Swiss-Prot record:
<dbReference type="GO" id="GO:0060320">
    <property type="term" value="P:rejection of self pollen"/>
</dbReference>
<feature type="signal peptide">
    <location>
        <begin position="1"/>
        <end position="20"/>
    </location>
</feature>
<keyword id="KW-0732">Signal</keyword>
<keyword id="KW-0713">Self-incompatibility</keyword>
<dbReference type="GO" id="GO:0005576">
    <property type="term" value="C:extracellular region"/>
</dbReference>
<dbReference type="InterPro" id="IPR010264">
    <property type="entry name" value="Self-incomp_S1"/>
</dbReference>
<comment type="similarity">
    <text>Belongs to the plant self-incompatibility (S1) protein family.</text>
</comment>
<dbReference type="Pfam" id="PF05938">
    <property type="entry name" value="Self-incomp_S1"/>
</dbReference>
<protein>
    <recommendedName>
        <fullName>S-protein homolog 10</fullName>
    </recommendedName>
</protein>
<keyword id="KW-0964">Secreted</keyword>
Length: 147
C-alpha cells in the first residue's frame, strides 16, 4: 500500500467512528397510560444518582439519560398510582435498568409504560409486554407493629 491508501483508510475509519453511536447515553423512559384522573409518581435511584419525585398525568412521558459505569449501572424505581399527590392506591418496585460490567452499553433505551393492569416494558423494537403487576396499597403508609 502506498501513503495515499493509508491516508484514505484513516479518513474512512475516522468518518465511520464519528457516525457511530459510540458514547451515546443510555435512557430510561416512562409513559403514563393510566386513566385521565390518575396520577403516576416515579422515583428512581442508583448507587450515585437520585431522580427525585416525578409526577405524570395521562399521556405524559419522563426520561433520564446516563452513561454506563465500567463496574455496573443499576437503576431501581418505585412507581405509584393514585388520584392525587397524597393518595396512592397501587405501587410497583422494580429494576428499570441494569448494565455495565464487562459489557458497556451505548444508546440502550428501556421504555416503561404504566397502564391500569401493570407496568409494560420494551426496548422500542418490539411490542411492549407486561412485566410487573401493581401491588395494592401504599408502602409508605404501612405501620410496623413493635411486637
Amino acid at each position: 500500500m502506498n501513503c495515499f491508501s493509508y491516508f484514505f483508510l484513516v479518513i474512512i475509519l475516522c468518518a465511520g467512528l464519528n457516525n457511530a453511536k459510540f458514547n451515546e447515553k443510555n435512557s430510561v423512559i416512562f409513559k403514563s397510560s393510566l386513566g385521565p384522573k390518575k396520577l403516576l409518581r416515579i422515583h428512581c435511584t442508583s448507587e450515585h444518582d437520585d431522580t427525585d419525585y416525578v409526577y405524570l398525568r395521562h399521556g405524559q412521558t419522563y426520561a433520564f439519560s446516563f452513561h454506563d459505569s465500567v463496574l455496573k449501572t443499576i437503576f431501581d424505581c418505585e412507581l405509584k398510582q393514585g388520584s392525587s399527590y397524597y393518595n396512592y392506591n397501587f405501587y410497583a418496585r422494580f429494576r428499570a435498568y441494569k448494565g455495565g460490567g464487562l459489557i458497556v452499553h451505548y444508546g440502550k433505551k428501556n421504555f416503561w409504560d404504566a397502564r391500569e393492569d401493570g407496568i409494560y416494558f420494551t426496548h422500542g423494537k418490539e411490542t411492549p409486554k407486561l412485566e410487573y403487576k401493581w401491588i395494592p396499597g401504599d408502602p409508605s403508609m404501612r405501620v410496623e407493629s413493635p411486637l
